[in-house]
Amino acid sequence: MMGRPEGLKLIDENGRRIDGRRKYELRKIHMEVGVLKNADGSAYIEWGKNKILAAVYGPREIHPKHLQRPDTAVLRVRYNMAPFSVEERKKPGPDRRSVEISKVIRGALEPALILEMFPRTVVDVFIEVLQADAGTRVAGITAASLALADAGVPMRDLVAACAAGKIDGEIVLDLNKDEDNYGEADVPVAIMPLKNDITLLQMDGYLTKEEFIEAVKLAIKGAKAVYQKQREALKEKYLKIAQEVAGDE
């Protein structure tokens, strides 16, 4: 949260936000599955102005071998922002924020994966932010979950994520960059809808207890809408495969 430029209104007198959305409206979301031929699973997501690519490799042999776990696979997640992903060029390579978000995303995904089926192996997840516009962690979780499903890693459910927040004293869904910079709070949430489980819940900023509950409920509602888009993207991929197989016969 940053100091706001004088006179900047995040919600106008008609209840419209700075990008024209209403309070409970998601940004435009586009998802594609199976976009990288050399990965075991992959997904690409455009969420507002965010552009994020996720790739999964494994389960595969883990090196060095002392990292092996005899009863389960190891999940490794690397979240990275490309140097050109933000307006001010970022130094290449992982920074403290990227390392922290990698751990957060791993924690959000791990409950959904049946890793005990593949002991002594590793599942590697790479998330590359090509363009950033607030909400990269929830978009990254959403893309990574799709890529894991595409790779055929056994899952209890997809993980879908969304954030709610507070701007100009109002609880709203899916903050954009200006709202994230100049708003009062941000609450990212990840869920497994079929299990009715929350796998990520964070808060940045200040909310009353009532506002926090409202924000969490709104973020869950948004995540359920994202979940439907994930399912549609997976169906679209396998429909294409079925059509290609039918065409070859």
Swiss-Prot record:
Name of the top EC class for this enzyme: hydrolase
Transmembrane segments: none
Coiled coil: none
InterPro entries, A to Z: ExoRNase_PH_dom1, ExoRNase_PH_dom2, ExoRNase_PH_dom2_sf, PNPase/RNase_PH_dom_sf, Ribosomal_Su5_D2-typ_SF, RNase_PH, Rrp41
Alphabetized GO MF terms: 3'-5'-RNA exonuclease activity; RNA binding
Keyword entries, A-Z: Cytoplasm, Exonuclease, Exosome, Hydrolase, Nuclease
GO annotations of cellular component type: cytoplasmic exosome (RNase complex)
SUPFAM superfamilies for this protein: Ribonuclease PH domain 2-like (SSF55666), Ribosomal protein S5 domain 2-like (SSF54211)
Pfam (any one): RNase_PH
Major location (coarse): cytoplasm
Record localization: Cytoplasm
GO annotation, biological process: gene expression; rRNA catabolic process
E.C. numbers: 3.1.13.-
Functional description taken from the UniProt entry: Catalytic component of the exosome, which is a complex involved in RNA degradation. Has 3'->5' exoribonuclease activity. Can also synthesize heteromeric RNA-tails.
Complex formation: Component of the archaeal exosome complex. Forms a hexameric ring-like arrangement composed of 3 Rrp41-Rrp42 heterodimers. The hexameric ring associates with a trimer of Rrp4 and/or Csl4 subunits.
Family assignment from sequence similarity: Belongs to the RNase PH family. Rrp41 subfamily.
Full protein name: Exosome complex component Rrp41
Organism ancestry: Archaea, Methanobacteriati, Methanobacteriota, Thermococci, Thermococcales
